[in-house]
Amino acid sequence: MAKDIEAAAAAEGGEYMAKDYSDPPPAPLIDAEELTKWSLYRAVIAEFVATLLFLYITVATVIGYKHQSDPGANAADAACSGVGILGIAWAFGGMIFILVYCTAGVSGGHINPAVTFGLFLARKVSLVRAVLYIVAQSLGAICGVGLVKGFQSAFYVRYGGGANELSDGYSKGTGLAAEIIGTFVLVYTVFSATDPKRNARDSHVPVLAPLPIGFAVFMVHLATIPITGTGINPARSLGAAVIYNQHKAWHDHWIFWVGPLIGAAIAAAYHQYVLRASAAKLGSSSSFRG
């Protein structure tokens, strides 16, 4: 069993908890001073570059798979159909693992507006940082997909540009539910992997936080690629839609923003008010008093 040294004792006016870890104080809603710090802009640049690389590798994988599995364009390879859905899922999950590992110490390794939104609701990041991250992630995604189109212009439009769309036979409600549940799994994993209590126990193995996050992305892709192509990342969906810019990319685009944001909000509430309720009560509750 995991080591958990928590001794509850009675004290005047309530209880206190002695523990082997400390919860960071809640981030301020608006921190104007943060705008004067280079560390913020360094983190924003890291989010931009990470999201650019994420979209470039993953969308290029999708386009390559569709080209290899197209019997009309590549009959020799059509029988083996390239990497397949499993390979696409590995590309998305593997890149998240790599990029979270590389950027966690600089920006926190969000690489996803839904993750940023969930952490903002949990008061892990300020509003200023959240807005700048989401802008950087969106621009990075657009640039990343733009590189794919530039390098593979012959195949990009022919194979759908890697854009998310609702598959035939599925209702909008089903697509929305798939995005909500998929994003919940991802953001729930992010909260669990970065929990201060877990970090205190596993800090000697720094790879442990990025690994489950990458696996969560991998597993969600296996489940939802047949339904929506798997969004769970509004920046990923926006970047592909902007560069592809066809009707089908925009027709149900709202699903890939509304679903992930709802899923992230539910995950934040579940983690903060159910799983970590005792820590919230015994922690910095005074910060919410006027």
Curated annotation (Swiss-Prot):
It is found in: Cell membrane. This is Probable aquaporin PIP2-3. One of its GO terms (molecular function) is water channel activity. CDD domains: MIP. Keywords: Cell membrane, Membrane, Repeat, Transmembrane, Transmembrane helix, Transport. InterPro entries: Aquaporin-like, Aquaporin_transptr, MIP, MIP_CS. Aquaporins facilitate the transport of water and small neutral solutes across cell membranes. SUPFAM superfamilies: Aquaporin-like (SSF81338). One of its GO terms (cellular component) is plasma membrane. The gene is PIP2-3. A motif (NPA 2) lies at residues 233-235. Belongs to the MIP/aquaporin (TC 1.A.8) family. PIP (TC 1.A.8.11) subfamily. A motif (NPA 1) lies at residues 112-114. The keyword Membrane applies. It comes from the Eukaryota. Expressed in roots.
